[in-house]
Amino acid sequence: MSKVLFVKGNPRSVDESVSVKMYQTFVDTYKEANPNDEVIELDIYNEQLPYLDSTMLAGIFKAGQQLELTAEEEEARKVADRYLTQFVEADKVVFAFPLWNFTIPAALHTYMDYLARAGVTFNYTAEGPVGLMGDKKVALLNARGGYYSEGPAAQLEMSLNYMKTMVGFFGVQDPVTVVIEGHNAVPDQAEEIINKGLEEVKKVAQSF
């Protein structure tokens, strides 16, 4: 039995958001195919995550150095540690997120800040940083209304590229990716584009 963490990085409803459609399709298909797995769903926007600020940074640093923390630093550190531990303990992690203003939503970025922890998800070495999460299976589900896979707009795509960079930094070198794009660029083909993409999501979920 695997422990699977599903991370939803969009506050909109399934009727309003393509990335949430991808998320829900993956969750439902995965549960049906793997009824005995432990599934944890994390809606980032429901968590009201505090930014990685000076208090949290001090708490994380001091804890790592076994120094005394203030009450505020300890509380902030515990918040980050809770999500970090949840991520580390999962055998598989699925992220669903949109491209917003060329990058990922701010709440998801804050969550990823929590996960980037030296000594836990990566280590510094003389040869450079080394990821420690190489055994973890990761899927990245990304929706973007325009076309960013190729052409001049490709260099502007910093959502999927960012997430690939982050999980790669953690040691996950081959995340499974599914992208639905172009549905806003060609509205008359939107339904076809979305449905085709959701079929791909189902296929990936069945074998994930």
UniProtKB/Swiss-Prot annotation:
One of its GO terms (molecular function) is oxidoreductase activity, acting on NAD(P)H, quinone or similar compound as acceptor. FMN binds at S17, V18, S19. Transmembrane segments: none annotated. It is an enzyme of class 1 (oxidoreductase). SUPFAM superfamilies: Flavoproteins. Binds 1 FMN per subunit. The keyword Signal does not apply. Its cofactor is FMN. It catalyses: 2 a quinone + NADH + H(+) = 2 a 1,4-benzosemiquinone + NAD(+); N,N-dimethyl-1,4-phenylenediamine + anthranilate + 2 NAD(+) = 2-(4-dimethylaminophenyl)diazenylbenzoate + 2 NADH + 2 H(+). Keywords: Flavoprotein, FMN, NAD, Oxidoreductase. Quinone reductase that provides resistance to thiol-specific stress caused by electrophilic quinones. Belongs to the azoreductase type 1 family. NCBIfam families: PRK13556.1. This is FMN-dependent NADH:quinone oxidoreductase 2. It comes from Halalkalibacterium halodurans (strain ATCC BAA-125 / DSM 18197 / FERM 7344 / JCM 9153 / C-125). The lineage of its organism: Bacteria, Bacillati, Bacillota, Bacilli, Bacillales. The gene is azoR2.
